[in-house]
Amino acid sequence: MVMGLGLFLLVFMLGLGLTPPTLAQDNSRYRDFLAKHYDATPQGRNDRYCESTMRRRHLTSPCKDINTFIHGNRHHIKAICGDENGNPYGENLRISKSPFQVTTCNLRGGSPRPPCQYRATRGSRNIVVGCENGLPVHLDESIFRP
């Protein structure tokens, strides 16, 4: 009985030790997603907005060809990964049931070297995300290309 309890406690403690890094990694990928693609209340949504926001978020070294910022409520974006605001889309992706306000920043010119100049395109559309453990970690920007 004592031996069984000791083994149980050992396995339980090992399980606790392994879980937090996994959760931390998931949260890290989600935080990266938010840093690259989420801006709750943008100012301007024009070319200057794209250039300053891309620079502030360190997405300009080298210049990124395209980046889309999603505006609105973070909870609604998370909900795409469940049935509340998302449906399966393609292979391992989810599409939002409701449209989001977005600003897509397209690199002008062909050089990947700063200074980066962007053209802003504003719109409202459904978005497609990749999810891990119920959190969005990837935005499929192929649907935003002209």
Swiss-Prot record:
GO MF, one term, reads: DNA binding
Q: In the UniProt entry, which residues are flagged as the active site?
A: H37 (proton acceptor), H138 (proton donor)
| Pfam families for the chain | RnaseA
Its Enzyme Commission number(s) read: 3.1.27.-
Keyword Nucleotidyltransferase belongs to the record: no
Pyrrolidone carboxylic acid found at: Q25
Its keywords, alphabetically, are: Angiogenesis, Cytoplasm, Developmental protein, Differentiation, Disulfide bond, DNA-binding, Endonuclease, Hydrolase, Nuclease, Nucleus, Protein synthesis inhibitor, Pyrrolidone carboxylic acid, Secreted, Signal, Stress response
Binding site residues for tRNA: R45, C105, I127
Q: What is known about what this protein does?
A: Secreted ribonuclease that can either promote or restrict cell proliferation of target cells, depending on the context. Endocytosed in target cells via its receptor PLXNB2 and translocates to the cytoplasm or nucleus. Under stress conditions, localizes to the cytoplasm and promotes the assembly of stress granules (SGs): specifically cleaves a subset of tRNAs within anticodon loops to produce tRNA-derived stress-induced fragments (tiRNAs), resulting in translation repression and inhibition of cell proliferation. tiRNas also prevent formation of apoptosome, thereby promoting cell survival.
Which PANTHER family does the record associate with it?
A: ANGIOGENIN, RIBONUCLEASE
Name of the protein this chain belongs to: Angiogenin
What is the source species? Chlorocebus aethiops
Name of the coding gene: ANG
